[in-house]
Amino acid sequence: MKLTKVFHLRPTLIQRIILGHLTYCVSKLWNVCNYARRNSDKFQSAYDQQKEFKDNFWYKNLPSQSAQSVIEKLAIAWKSFFSAKKNGNLENPRPPKFKPKTHHSTITFKRNNFKIIDNKIRITISKQSKECLSEKHAIESKYLWIDLDKSLSLDGDVKIIEIVPLWDGSYNVHLVVEKEVSYKRETGNVMSIDLGIKNLATISFSNSVDSFIIDGSQLLSVNRYFDKEISKLQQINNLQGREKNTKRINQLWDKRRTQVKQILHSASNEIISLANRYDTDTIVIGDLTNIREDADYGKKTNQKLHKWNFDRFVSYIEYKARLSGISVEKISEAYTSQCCSVHLSATEIGSLHAKKSNRKHRGLYCCNECGAVLNADQNGSRNILKKYLLRVGKSLRRGVVALASPVRLAWDGHCFSRLTQSYVSS
């Protein structure tokens, strides 16, 4: 499996000049190739453009695989544009934009362009770039050297390095590491997760009546606060006729990303901890692929859905689960919130038995047929579990008429703290 290790780089003067040159060349190559695509009468594949531009000045300033990566990313962006146009997913899809004149873009280095030597990254500089750096900056170097962060543990083979320029002149260095995970847990126990906004994750188990709710209030609070502060400063910016973000706005964006990342990592850590505690070998997650495109929940809720990065959270769960020998599956959430998980079988979860009226208000599900009263997200989580077990030819080992009340795990400023310890059935 592939893991991404990240560390922050505050460059030396020479590193700043070399990286500034390379990341600028990435933007220029993107624009040249994008212009060609926009003005071409026929379709151009990534391979076509790589052949066409291999002698281009900006292409030759980059290592060949880095230049190819720029063209491949542009091809993916155009493919997404054509797909959105064809499927009608977006109201008015636009082709990939040009990078601003002085923009610096992320540069990708593949395996042939770098080596890890004595806890340092050695990146090969192209012949064209060596000439430019020598003429303009009197830098005579075949390689760019970057010290690895001392706290970084590279327990695998580094396949790709991406260097991301930040607004303050520093960089984030991403190392994609391939690690072998041979261990696979096989217990037959399944955890199901219903993802949401107010309740970040509601968790149920096939081998227990226990359930847990990871509270999403802090994530909402963080987004609400930064929305407000950034909006204020952007209004001032607009009144003053500034096009670029101020230093303060960029700082707020950085703080927001950091806080959201911390919360999502902590929540995913808690999920894996529970999976280990309940001896789970499979985590099944409600698939939210089309929730943002297909649903209209009102302006405020739609804003929350767009801010909340479901994909990132799921990716954190997936890679951490694999490291523990746990597989992750996705299953449609259709009708799971409207059907009763107490008396309906897995085959009955569908439009025929779905009743919106059973969901009385946020947080409460009351079944008019069997009289069951339970947490609404807990009900959804149990139905996700039932649907998955049906798919793999299994069923719940026990009835669910005596479900335990969900244990709420709340953010305490550092992590999600457990309020009680539930009994785990055998």
Task: Tell me the role of every PLM-derived stretch.
Residues 9, 60, 64, 254-261, ...:
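Hydrophobic alpha-helical scaffolding
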Residues 304, 308-426:
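Positively charged, low-complexity nucleic-acid-binding target-recognition regions
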Residues 1-69:
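Gly/serine-rich nucleotide phosphate-binding loop at the start of the catalytic core
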Residues 47-166, 303, 307:
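Acidic carboxylate diad motif detector
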Residues 33, 70-81, 378-388:
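Stable alpha-helical structural segments in soluble proteins, enriched in small hydrophobic residues
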Residues 39-55, 156-158, 165-314, 395-426:
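Substrate-contacting helices/loops that form the catalytic groove of nucleic-acid
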Residues 114, 119-123, 170-173, 200-201, ...:
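Hydrophobic residues embedded in beta-strands of well-ordered beta-sheets
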